[in-house]
Structure formats: C-alpha cells, structure tokens
C-alpha cells in the first residue's frame, strides 16, 4: 500500500518494453512551436544588431567627442588641433546615466589645452581675461549684445573654469590631497559661477564617474603588456591544468572508493576534534570571573570575541558539533549501501568516458559557441550604448510658438524658427534621441541581455543532450562496448539538432526568463540602496532569494529533462515530468549521489586549481631558483597568475562537467533499469556487474531446452 501511495503521487514505474535498447532512433520533432519562436527571435536579434551597428559608434567609448559628436584631435577635421575634451559642468558626470550612455549630460567641447586657473564667467566678463576664457566657450562664440545671464542660459560658455589636468585626452580637475584635505589647485571650495561657493567633493564625485572608464583603459594597457610577455607561460600553465584534470579523471576510475571514504573519515575526525576543542575550552573557563554569564544577560555585542570568554558559548558549539557528528554517523550507518552505489556509479562513469573519449573534447565546442554569444552580446551592447546623440531644444519666452522643439545649432540662426522667435536660443538638452529607435534603446538593451541568456542556455542545453545521448548508448548496451554505435557522440549531436531544437529552446527560454528577472531585480536593488524604506528592501531580498532558488531548481530539472529527451525523444514537458517523478521515487538515492559526486568534483577542482595556482605564483614571483631568470618582468604579477587560476578552473570545470553529465545520465538509466527489468533471461539488467553485486541482483541465464 505504501508503494502504491508513493507511486501514485509520483507516477508509476517504467514498464518493461522488449523493443527498448537504449536511445530511440525512430523519433520525431518535438516542441516545433518553440523552434519557430527561437528562429524568429534570432532573426530579430540579428536585426537589432544591424540597426545598432548602423547608429552606434564604439569609438565614443575610447576617444573623446564633443556635444556635436565630433572627435577631438582627429586629423582632417576642424578639431585636429584640439585634442582635449572639456566638460562645462563636470559635477553632472556623477549621474548614473554616464555608465549606461558613455556620456556626461553636460555640454562638451574640444580645446587645445585644459584650464590652469580658477575663473568665473562673471569675473572675466569685460576684462582682458575674457580672451583666455573664450577658448572654453562653444566654437565661434561672439559676445554681441548678450549678457552673462543669457550666455549661461544658452549654454555657450561654462559658468566657471577650474584648474585641470589632461588624462586620456579629457580635462579633469587637478585633485590632490594636502595634509589629509582634498584640494583642487590651492583651494578646498570653488565658486560655481552663480554667486555661491561649493565644496570640492562635488567635483570629486563627478570626476570619479567620468574618470572611471579612463583609469580602466590605462589599466587595460598595462595588463595587455603583461599578456604580451607572459602568454607563453600562461599557455604552459593551462596545459598542466589539462593534464592534471585528465589524470584526476583516470584516478577516479580506480580510486573513487578510497577517495570518498577518506573524505568521510576526515569529516568525522574534524568534527570530533571540534567537539574535543570545545570541551577543553569549556573546562578551561571553569572558575574564571565572568565566564558563567549567559549570552542573554550579556546581550548583543559588536565585538564577537567577547562571547568566546563565556562557557555557555563553548557549550553551545559543543552541542551543535555533537549533533552534526551523530547525524553523519547515523547517515553512514543507514545509507552506507547508497554511498556504495554512488561510488560504483562514479567508477562506471569513468569507464563510459573511457569508451567515449571524444566527449572530453566536446566542452571546446560549447566554449566556442559561448564565446560567439558573448562577443555578439557585448558588441551589440556597446553599439546600442553609443547610439545616443546630442539633442538640442529651442528655449525662449512663453510667446515663442516653437518653444521646446528640436533644433540644430549649426543651422538654427538662419532657420524660420529663429526669425519667428528672435530671443530664442538652440540649447543642448540631453543625450539620447527622439526617433522611435532612440526611445526604444532601453528596451533593446533588455532584449539584448535576454537573448544572450536564451542563446547561452541553449548552447549549454545542446551540450547536455549530446553527452546524455552518448553515455546512455553506453549504459543500454548489453555487451559493452560491442553493442554501442560506432560514433555515439556525433549520433547524439545530430539527433539533438535534427529533432529536439524546439525542446532545447523551450527549456532554455524558461531559464532565460528567470535569469532576466534576476538581473532586473539586481538593478532595482541598486536603485533602492539609497532609499530608507526597510519594507521595500526586505521585499527585494525575499524576491531575490526566491528567484535564486527557482533558477537552481529549473537548472536541475532541465538537466534531467534533457537526459530523458536524449533517451526517449519526448517533448520537454513530458521529459521533465517523467524525470522529476523518477527522481522523486528514488529521492534518497538522488540526495546521496548528488552530494557525494559534488563533493568529489569540488575536491578535484580545488586540487587542480590550487596546484597550478601555487606553481604559477612561485614562478611569476621569481621564487623558483631553477627558472628564476626565465620568468618575465611584469607590471602586475597577479595578471598571469589570476589568468592561470581562472583558466585552470574553466578547464577543470569543462572536464568535470562531462564527467558529471555522465554520472547523472548513468544514474537515471540505472533507476530505469531497476524499474524496467528483473534480471530474468527475458528482462536482463543492463547495469554493470559491480552494481548488480551491490544490490544483490543477478541476470539469470536462459534455460537450455
């Protein structure tokens, strides 16, 4: 009755099918609608990229441009002798829009040199100093009969000049510290040109935002220099990581059992030592003044070291560690058989990888496709961000019929609008644009990010289905490897693309939706950081936590659904349901296997990354005497070391992702094998002899007539 209730809640066990011999070859296309939707989305994505490439100019990220979009210092232009960019009001560069649009929302002009003195327009007006001041006004500026107020309203001159220095062709305030006080030039405050004085810190904030991307550029140049002299040794380090990853996978085949049990024993010993240490501290504090005060009486203390002088603290630690120790020992006693099954599956996965060795190279295909996705997303994002244009508006008195309309400063004075409104002016308003394309820029950026998530998840899903199909053909071969197809990996790849593109698109679409929601929540969280609404912060934290958990669950469900797709060729929803029910019918085995394999793979990654990282550290810091003179001189020795560490992790992760997919595939096949077959001559088990021995299962020999 208990089994019936369990199977009723989570479906019924797989029934015996005499025609089933592994991955089904006669299958049809699944989730065709999602396949069409993916195709249309890709067409739209390409169109967005083409439009962005037409309007955008990535040179705006690197080279300075004035408010009219003209590059400073470019040969053959009127700004050829004006290499530096000057901001009218650099304080406005502290706006968050700078990061999104790569532009400060203030008029900008190209100048021959940066200002070297404090000077306001009001003080310079009608004095000889105005000749110096005029070079920082808009090109071809003439006083005529305008007053200071009108010039400032028209945005033709800055209100104030501040001592500045050029940095990456931009003029930034000459900020320095004197006896701990931030100064620009020789002052700590400045006149804003409107009769009031402001603190230097406002300039600092503006300069920080505008200067951030420039400092990153200089850093990038030094890093590039380091790569040019150390790339050879970085490649050698990555090759060592690849060799170590292969050796670890080979060792798992023979030493998986020993490694698992050694780790379990070490965990028990560490917890045991923790209990002993807590008891010794508890006994040592006996009789000491103040050690018997309870935690509740002491209350909350910001210095947590105070609690270590209380006996109650060590007693609590000892109780917690003792409970953990007892739980682990009880789990080992009652789950020892399932741990042995997990070890046997890991060994079996090593054999499967050995028979399908080309599977270890498949992560290179995934890596290449992901690089294409990242490159297209990044380039499109940059082109979209640099699509904004300087927008000018007509500003005049209330009687002007053209008030607020868009204008062009080059032609405004000869236009009908200027004749209709003699007192009007064409003034810089903002960076953006008023076309439908410019109004849709934010939406296009979100679509760009969403498509990146969708395509990246699709590439990962394609790899998982391909590997699952190859390893499933190994498990369901009764005589291994004789009954396996000639090229299992290529056959699985072809089936995945030919029949299941729609299913892969469906699964990756669900995951992409959750991921883009998480990105939007992160953006909103950043916007709410300055707010004091505690309820909003609490709600945002809960939402972020929920969607993080949802993403993890969907990834787990998708992974197992792709295995079922690779084996049976069913659509995504059917495969996800069948995989979920199969796992829930064997939930304890799933939990044990998942944790054992995760722990083993984590150990392997740490071992490989740690070994190669330590070797790289000693080499690039000239601490290995044998090759001390061989190591190249560097600006930042952490650049090649960090590259080797990250690269080693990616290589190890690539190898272990193949191994992990193999274990998961064999595990699902193993569970189905137990439900489908009974070991008779008509329904023999497909599992290895080691697994059959652990489960006390045997295949009965056919009765000879």
Curated annotation (Swiss-Prot):
N-glycosylated; contains sialic acid. Not O-glycosylated. It catalyses: choline(out) + n H(+)(in) = choline(in) + n H(+)(out); ethanolamine(out) + n H(+)(in) = ethanolamine(in) + n H(+)(out). Glycans are attached at residues 186, 199, 414. Residues 53-231, 277-314, 385-455, 525-562, 620-637 are extracellular. GO terms for cellular component: mitochondrial outer membrane; plasma membrane. GO terms for molecular function: antiporter activity; choline transmembrane transporter activity; ethanolamine transmembrane transporter activity. It is found in: Cell membrane; Mitochondrion outer membrane. It is a multi-pass membrane protein. The modification Phosphothreonine is found at residue 12. Keywords: Antiport, Cell membrane, Glycoprotein, Membrane, Mitochondrion, Mitochondrion outer membrane, Phosphoprotein, Sialic acid, Transmembrane, Transmembrane helix, Transport. The chain crosses the membrane at residues 32-52, 232-252, 256-276, 315-335, 364-384, 456-478, 504-524, 563-583, 599-619, 638-658. Its main location: membrane. Expressed at high levels in lung, colon and in supporting cells of the inner ear (at protein level). Progressively lower levels in brain, tongue, liver and kidney (at protein level). In the tongue, strongly expressed in epithelial cells and in nerves within the musculature. Within the nerves, expression observed in the perineurial cells of the nerve sheath, in the Schwann cells and myelinated nerve fibers (at protein level). Residues 1-31, 253-255, 336-363, 479-503, 584-598, 659-705 are cytoplasmic. GO terms for biological process: choline transport; ethanolamine transport. Choline/H+ antiporter, mainly in mitochodria. Also acts as a low-affinity ethanolamine/H+ antiporter, regulating the supply of extracellular ethanolamine (Etn) for the CDP-Etn pathway, redistribute intracellular Etn and balance the CDP-Cho and CDP-Etn arms of the Kennedy pathway. Interacts with COCH. Belongs to the CTL (choline transporter-like) family. PANTHER family: CHOLINE TRANSPORTER-LIKE (SLC FAMILY 44) (PTHR12385), CHOLINE TRANSPORTER-LIKE PROTEIN 2 (PTHR12385:SF34). Antibody KHRI-3, which is directed against a N-linked carbohydrate of CTL2, causes hearing loss when infused in the organ of Corti. This is Choline transporter-like protein 2. It comes from Cavia porcellus (Guinea pig).
């Amino acid at each position: 009755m208990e089994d019936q209730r369990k199977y009723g809640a989570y479906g019924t066990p797989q029934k015996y099918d005499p025609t089933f011999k592994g991955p089904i070859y006669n299958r049809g296309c699944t989730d065709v609608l999602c396949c069409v939707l993916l195709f249309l989305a890709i067409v739209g994505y390409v169109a967005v990229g083409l439009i962005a490439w037409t309007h955008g100019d990535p040179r705006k990220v690197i080279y300075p441009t004035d408010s009219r979009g003209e590059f400073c210092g470019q040969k053959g232009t009127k700004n050829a002798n004006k290499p530096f960019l000057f901001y009218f009001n650099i304080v406005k560069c502290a706006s968050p829009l700078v990061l999104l649009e790569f532009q400060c929302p203030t008029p900008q002009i190209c100048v021959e040199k940066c200002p070297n003195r404090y000077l306001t327009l009001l003080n310079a007006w009608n004095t000889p100093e105005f000749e110096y001041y005029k070079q920082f006004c808009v090109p071809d500026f003439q006083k005529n009969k305008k007053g200071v107020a009108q010039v400032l309203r028209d945005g033709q001159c800055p209100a104030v000049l501040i001592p500045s220095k050029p940095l990456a062709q931009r003029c930034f305030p000459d900020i320095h510290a004197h006896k701990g006080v931030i100064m620009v030039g020789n002052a700590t405050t400045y006149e804003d040109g409107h009769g009031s004085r402001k603190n230097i810190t406002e300039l600092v904030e503006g300069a920080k935002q505008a200067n951030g991307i420039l400092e990153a550029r200089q850093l990038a140049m030094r890093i590039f220099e380091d790569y040019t002299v150390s790339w050879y040794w970085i490649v050698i380090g990555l090759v060592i990581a690849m060799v170590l990853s292969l050796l670890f996978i080979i060792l798992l085949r023979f030493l998986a059992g020993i490694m698992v049990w050694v780790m379990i024993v070490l965990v028990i010993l560490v917890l045991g030592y923790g209990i002993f240490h807590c008891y010794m501290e508890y006994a040592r504090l006996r009789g000491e003044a103040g050690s018997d005060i309870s935690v509740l009486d002491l209350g909350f203390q910001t210095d947590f070291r105070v609690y270590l002088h209380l006996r109650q603290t060590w007693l609590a630690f000892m109780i917690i560690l003792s409970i953990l120790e007892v739980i682990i020992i009880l789990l080992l006693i009652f789950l020892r058989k399932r741990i042995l099954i997990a070890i046997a599956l890991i060994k079996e996965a090593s054999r499967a990888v050995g028979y399908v060795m080309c599977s270890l190279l498949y992560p290179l295909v995934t890596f290449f496709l992901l690089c294409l996705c990242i490159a297209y997303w990044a380039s499109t994002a940059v082109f979209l961000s640099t699509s904004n244009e300087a927008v000018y508006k007509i500003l005049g008195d209330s009687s002007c019929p053209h008030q607020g309309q868009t204008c062009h400063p080059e032609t405004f004075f000869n236009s009908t609008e200027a004749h209709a409104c003699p007192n009007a002016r064409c003034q810089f308003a903002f960076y953006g644009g008023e076309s439908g394309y410019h109004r849709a820029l934010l939406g296009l950026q979100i679509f760009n990010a969403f498509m990146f998530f969708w395509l990246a998840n699709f590439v990962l899903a394609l790899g998982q289905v391909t590997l699952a199909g190859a390893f499933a053909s190994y498990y369901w071969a009764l005589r291994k490897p004789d009954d396996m197809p000639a090229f299992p990996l290529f056959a699985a790849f072809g089936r995945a693309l030919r029949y299941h593109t729609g299913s892969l698109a469906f699964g990756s679409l669900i995951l992409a939706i959750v991921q883009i929601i998480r990105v939007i929540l992160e953006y909103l969280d950043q916007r709410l950081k300055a707010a004091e609404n505690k309820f909003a912060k609490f709600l945002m934290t809960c939402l972020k936590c929920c969607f993080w958990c949802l993403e993890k669950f969907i990834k787990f469900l998708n992974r197992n659904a792709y295995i079922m797709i690779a084996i049976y060729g069913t659509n995504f929803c059917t495969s996800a349901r069948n995989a979920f029910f199969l796992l829930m019918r064997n939930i304890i085995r799933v939990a044990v296997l998942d944790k054992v394999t995760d722990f083993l793979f984590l150990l392997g990654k740490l071992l490989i990354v740690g070994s190669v990282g330590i070797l790289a550290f000693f080499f690039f810091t000239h601490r290995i005497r044998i090759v001390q003179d061989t190591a190249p001189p560097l600006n930042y020795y952490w650049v090649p070391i960090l590259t080797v560490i990250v690269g080693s992790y990616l290589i190890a992760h690539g190898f272990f992702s193949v191994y992990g997919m193999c274990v998961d595939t064999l595990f699902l096949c193993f569970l189905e094998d137990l439900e489908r077959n009974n070991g008779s001559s008509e329904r023999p088990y497909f599992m290895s002899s080691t697994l059959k021995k652990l489960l006390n299962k045997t295949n009965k020999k056919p009765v000879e007539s």
